Amino acid sequence: MELATTQSVLMQIQPTIQRFARMLASVLQLEVEIVDENLCRVAGTGAYGKFLGRQLSGNSRLLRHVLETKTEKVVTQSRFDPLCEGCDSKENCREKAFLGTPVILQDRCVGVISLIAVTHEQQEHISDNLREFSDYVRHISTIFVSKLLEDQGPGDNISKIFATMIDNMDQGVLVVDDENRVQFVNQTALKTLGVVQNNIIGKPIRFRPLTFESNFTHGHMQHIVSWDDKSELIIGQLHNIQGRQLFLMAFHQSHTSFSVANAPDEPHIEQLVGECRVMRQLKRLISRIAPSPSSVMVVGESGTGKEVVARAIHKLSGRRNKPFIAINCAAIPEQLLESELFGYVKGAFTGASANGKTGLIQAANTGTLFLDEIGDMPLMLQAKLLRAIEAREILPIGASSPIQVDIRIISATNQNLAQFIAEGKFREDLFYRLNVIPITLPPLRERQEDIELLVHYFLHLHTRRLGSVYPGIAPDVVEILRKHRWPGNLRELSNLMEYLVNVVPSGEVIDSTLLPPNLLNNGTTEQSDVTEVSEAHLSLDDAGGTALEEMEKQMIREALSRHNSKKQVADELGIGIATLYRKIKKYELLNT
């Protein structure tokens, strides 16, 4: 590296840009490097925070490419990009992924903002969020130029960058100054805390971390957040950035709660607790498909929260202020299910109400109908439901004229409907109508990264409900819980936390002596191979019908056209990578 001989426009405001880099790294959980037009490092984080002001070596081909072409450069797999050929560091490159965005001032590229992954987790983070990060950094770059360079007001306009960054986050964010007064708060945080901006900006606020060692969760920690006469318990991360504290909420524990047994009245996307990759993908998918009127099929084992997902989709849709009607097809006797769904008119049959009855489908008009355990619906009713979906009308029992209905149907099952179709237990044509948008929920055993976060979530849920003191939890207990197979999924974990809240002495720590015997016996056993439920909605080999296979082939072809990575295709379809390659070979899609 060499010292720069002339000071660039970016280098003139280097302290501000360094602050900007640290903010960006904290928000996106990636390394950041910013260089000027002379390839001098203006700012950086981690290993890229060294040698500021010095010119980078000739191996900086990616940065040089962005400067010369004035275009964005993306590398999701290091060493395989053509620009990496001939690089001295190619075989030992620490950069696993790269996203470089040009800083354009008056048609001149004056620098590059780059996001860098140095771990496999960060590499997946970039790949999973590529479009969002690209748009995000491009937007920030525009503001960066217009407010910092053209206005030459670095001191004042850093606030505008802060505000833009946090407003574009789906996490709740609070930023306080060196006097602990709230300086910024984004819409997600306002919504979560139930306050309006004018009632919290400028107010002194206190973050008091709980002291149990085991409360740390992948860098998150429980905090008592207090302002005015209010106190809230929130799990999140607190970052110090040059005189400011930036608090990133993982989730809030004091308002409407995620409940498996009893879903909240108004669930939102952030109440799907989890930060593992599959849960992040699930939340993004729900956000994308919620506005659509198309039918959704939610597939998942018992206890994975299928109704919570259905309610979240409804609350994010344009039907949010309309009815959400839920019915469990397995919980109602077959002879009563038709009248519950379709209703009946006065005198329709012996024992009928004198006034008749409005069916649940009609009650859901203009809103959402959630059909849980759809696989248990009798075949006769399946035909009637199909007619209602296709004609957008229902015929109550005993009625002579149909009633028009406008509903969105979300169905759910923990069964293999493809097998049911092959056995003649489920109508193939109804499956097509209901499975327009398939969503697969992961079992808890595949979410080990989220176990500790969920443990604290349910602990707070039950201590608050039972009026108990919040307990600590020993690290070895958390490890046992991570290794447990959780056949009951979230419902089982919630019930266990309720049990522990009841038996732990007030104010003490939950240790392994309090765990039920079945957890101690099974918690450390190796997990056996299991058939993924996620394949249930896609793997239709056993159905035996050409139409089903054609549908499967089309789904795979369309997914392949949308993604460059087979891993991304498999993730979207909810199947394993080996299964995907098997299907590609079967349907001769190798050149797609």
From Swiss-Prot:
Keywords: ATP-binding, DNA-binding, Nucleotide-binding, Transcription, Transcription regulation. Residues 567-585 bind DNA. SUPFAM superfamilies: Homeodomain-like, P-loop containing nucleoside triphosphate hydrolases, PYP-like sensor domain (PAS domain). PANTHER family: PTS-DEPENDENT DIHYDROXYACETONE KINASE OPERON REGULATORY PROTEIN-RELATED, TRANSCRIPTIONAL REGULATORY PROTEIN. The keyword Lipid biosynthesis does not apply. Disruption phenotype: Deletion of the gene abolishes urate-degrading activity. Essential for both formate-dependent and formate-independent uric acid degradation. May be directly involved in the transcription of uacF in response to hypoxanthine, xanthine, and uric acid. This is Putative uric acid sigma-54-dependent transcriptional regulator UacR. ATP binds at residues 300-307, 364-373. It comes from Escherichia coli (strain K12). The gene is uacR. One of its GO terms (biological process) is urate catabolic process. The keyword Electron transport does not apply. CDD domains: AAA, PAS. Residues 158-229 form the PAS domain. GO terms for molecular function: ATP binding; ATP hydrolysis activity; cis-regulatory region sequence-specific DNA binding; DNA-binding transcription activator activity. Pfam families: HTH_8 (PF02954), PAS_8 (PF13188), Sigma54_activat (PF00158). It comes from the Bacteria. Residues 272-502 form the Sigma-54 factor interaction domain. One of its GO terms (cellular component) is protein-DNA complex.
